[in-house]
Regions:
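Domain-level signal for Mg2+-assisted phosphodiester chemistry and nucleotide/NA-binding surfaces
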Residues: 1-91
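Extended two-metal-dependent nuclease catalytic cores across DNA- and RNA-processing enzymes
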Residues: 20, 71-232
């Protein structure tokens, strides 16, 4: 069975932003979200549907390594109570809601997709997200594509490691600075072996990779155990 995996906060905040633009988010949020979800369901008919949510405390270990991690995000325009409450709509439409305690959705999606592929290697797995961090799930072979529901297209998967690339150039949206004085062109030269990092740059690169590379999450075994038990409860 093919699988559809939604990065729920990423997707649902997009629907809330559209509702905000109407001047009456409280009234229009759920109808807009329902329309978008039904459209996706029509696009991916016959797919098993998973809705993956961020949970409180999920960023803790990354913030311990980098106090700037996601510190620059302003979510004041969003009603998170309403966004979290929309999980009932997902359930009504046949999605299986997954909330791993103290876990970012990125990490949960990584493990969920891995488990789906382990159960059936021929299972086509599509992630719904605008988050380019999800590229690493595809590059690890755990998903087959990432659908950007705003641009209405699949995110391009680069030939180079997105984890290594972002560990060099940084990720402004997550507050990860990257290696100083090396831009995107320089990063490509590093990744293709045209130039090398010095020892100090390598240390910075590795510290950034600790944040970006989901495989370096020390809580991954616990996440895997939780999702295995969650799967058992759903079958």
């Amino acid at each position: 069975m093919n699988s559809l995996v939604i990065d729920c906060f990423n997707f649902t905040m997009g629907a809330y932003a559209l509702a905000n633009n109407t001047g009456n988010a409280e009234k229009n949020f759920l109808p807009i979200l329902r329309t978008q979800l039904v459209s996706l369901m029509n696009q991916y008919k016959g797919y098993d549907k998973y809705a993956v949510w961020d949970t409180a405390g999920g960023t803790t270990f990354r913030k311990e390594k980098n106090s700037s991690y996601k510190a620059n995000r302003d979510h004041s325009a969003f009603d998170f109570k309403a966004i979290r409450g929309s999980s009932s709509l997902y359930e009504e439409l046949g999605f299986k809601n997954l909330s791993v305690p103290q876990c970012e959705a990125d990490d949960a999606i990584f493990v969920l997709c891995k488990k789906l592929k382990e159960r059936n290697h021929n299972n086509k797995v599509i992630i719904i997200s605008r988050d380019r961090d999800m590229i690493q799930v595809v590059q690890q072979g755990y998903a087959d594509g990432i659908w950007d529901n705003v641009k209405k297209g699949y995110i391009d998967i680069p030939y180079y490691s997105i984890v290594d690339f972002k560990s060099i150039v940084g990720d402004r949206s997550d507050g990860v600075s990257g290696v100083p004085r090396i831009g995107e062109k320089g990063a490509i030269k590093v990744l293709t072996g045209l130039i090398t990092l010095n020892e100090e740059q390598k240390k910075i690169f590795e510290s950034c990779k600790d944040i970006i590379d989901i495989r370096r999450n020390p809580n991954l075994p616990k996440i895997e155990e939780f999702i295995e038990e969650w799967f058992s409860s759903k079958n």
